[in-house]
């Protein structure tokens, strides 16, 4: 009698009555149950979540074949997981990349990339308005390894050219667009400048998304995402990704295995789920962002709007060349002081007062209060005026959001 019907598409092993009797000798039924239906394949249309820390080999021969790289299998969860690998393949297709590595957060992804690719005593060039924690990591930690970092303005092309010509620069790193002022670099141009001298280019395209910008096709060597944001799109997990050539991503993967910032397979599943609707979400956010930028720029109680879709933005023409949409993140300055801006923020009804961006829900924050722990003089030096607002538009109805913003402006 066959205990499990033999079906090659559904399971790897078939357990017969004689095998059950053999397994049962000296074991109770619980242990027998644990051995049945392991490694079962299904016809599910959704990617399976594989929650396991380790993987078994059917015999020692298979184990040795794996160790000697004759077959490709899984061994331990920190080194790989079927759910996570499916996610990596999907992101690679989106980015046009040879390989992708997904990790526990965007912050971890950028840090391990820098550690893997910049040698001791190497030199990094980065833009001044890169993510605050990334800058802290560069200035306070990488310098302990003898790595020097030069920060330049995002539009300082001449400065970049001088640095790569006169120094052995290992890597150029920038966000494009940046947060919160939505500055962008000409990716084709900076890649051309850097590649002449053998300098790698990594672009954090979190705000751009793989939908609105094909970063690798524009010439960058690597594209980084905080997948927590637009790719996941639901504000319910942390994740980061690096995509690029097999050679570069493999170097990052090797260090990642040592550092251990592994993405949980449940989070990988949520990210795969989010990717199914990303193009729809981003399309809605592109539309809402563009229309709200125009509404805000025309409003007498708004003194300035930062949005690449507007001709008033200094990098508007660059964005038009390399992006197919601008997204749902806008920064703007209220015509008033700190208290006036707080009054506007607190009068809003739809968005949550929260950090982050890119999810289904609209989020708003006043940058001065979001970085309240930084002295005001330092905030002002970096352009964070007391009246600066960052608004991440979600997928709510445009007319509802517009009405809410306008009524809040009427209160000041």
UniProtKB/Swiss-Prot annotation:
Pathway: Amino-acid biosynthesis; L-methionine biosynthesis via de novo pathway; L-cystathionine from O-succinyl-L-homoserine: step 1/1. GO terms for biological process: methionine biosynthetic process; transsulfuration. Its cofactor is pyridoxal 5'-phosphate. It is an enzyme of class 2 (transferase). It comes from the Eukaryota. Pfam families: Cys_Met_Meta_PP. Binds 1 pyridoxal 5'-phosphate per subunit. InterPro entries: CGS1/2 (IPR044639), Cys/Met-Metab_PyrdxlP-dep_enz (IPR000277), Cys_met_metab_PP (IPR054542), PyrdxlP-dep_Trfase (IPR015424), PyrdxlP-dep_Trfase_major (IPR015421), PyrdxlP-dep_Trfase_small (IPR015422). One of its GO terms (molecular function) is cystathionine gamma-synthase activity. The modification N6-(pyridoxal phosphate)lysine is found at residue 229. Pyridoxal 5'-phosphate binds at residues 76, 78, 106-107, 131, 226, 228. Keywords: Amino-acid biosynthesis, Methionine biosynthesis, Pyridoxal phosphate, Transferase. Belongs to the trans-sulfuration enzymes family. This is Probable cystathionine gamma-synthase 2. It comes from Arabidopsis thaliana.
């Amino acid at each position: 009698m066959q205990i499990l019907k033999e079906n090659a598409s559904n399971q790897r092993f078939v357990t017969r009555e004689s095998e059950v009797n053999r397994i049962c000798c000296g074991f109770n039924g619980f242990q027998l149950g644990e051995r049945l239906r392991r490694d079962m394949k299904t016809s599910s249309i959704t990617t399976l979540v594989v929650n396991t820390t380790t993987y078994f080999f059917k015999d020692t021969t298979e184990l040795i074949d794996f160790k000697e790289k004759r077959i490709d299998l899984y061994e331990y969860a920190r080194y790989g997981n079927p759910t996570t690998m499916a996610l990596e393949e999907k992101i690679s297709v989106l980015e046009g990349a040879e390989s992708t590595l997904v990790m526990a957060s965007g912050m971890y992804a950028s840090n391990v990339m820098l550690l893997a690719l910049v040698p001791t005593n190497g030199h990094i060039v980065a833009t001044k308005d890169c993510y605050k924690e990334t800058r802290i990591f560069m200035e306070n930690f990488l310098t302990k390894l003898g790595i020097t970092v030069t920060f330049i303005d995002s539009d300082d092309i001449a400065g970049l050219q001088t640095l790569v010509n006169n120094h052995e620069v290992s890597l150029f790193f920038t966000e494009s667009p940046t947060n919160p002022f939505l500055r962008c670099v000409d990716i084709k141009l900076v890649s051309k400048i850097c590649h002449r001298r053998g300098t790698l280019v990594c672009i954090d395209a979190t705000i751009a998304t793989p939908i609105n910008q094909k970063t690798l096709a524009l010439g960058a060597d690597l594209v980084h995402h905080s997948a927590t944001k637009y790719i996941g799109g639901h504000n319910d997990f942390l994740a980061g990704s690096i995509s690029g050539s097999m050679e570069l991503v493999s170097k990052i993967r090797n260090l990642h295995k040592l550092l251990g910032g592994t993405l949980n397979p449940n989070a990988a599943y949520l990210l795969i789920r989010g990717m199914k609707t990303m193009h729809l979400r981003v399309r809605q956010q592109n539309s809402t962002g563009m229309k709200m930028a125009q509404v805000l720029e025309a409003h007498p109680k708004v003194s300035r709007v930062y949005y690449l879709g507007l001709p008033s933005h200094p990098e508007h023409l660059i964005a038009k060349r390399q992006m197919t949409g601008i997204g749902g993140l806008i920064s703007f300055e209220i015509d008033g002081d700190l208290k006036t801006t707080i009054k506007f923020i607190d009068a809003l009804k739809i968005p949550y007062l929260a950090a982050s961006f890119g999810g289904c829900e609209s989020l708003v924050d006043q940058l001065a209060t979001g970085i309240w722990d930084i002295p005001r003089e330092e905030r002002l030096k970096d352009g964070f005026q007391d009246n600066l607002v960052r608004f991440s538009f979600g997928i709510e109805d445009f007319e509802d959001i517009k009405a809410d913003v306008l009524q809040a402006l009427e209160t000041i």
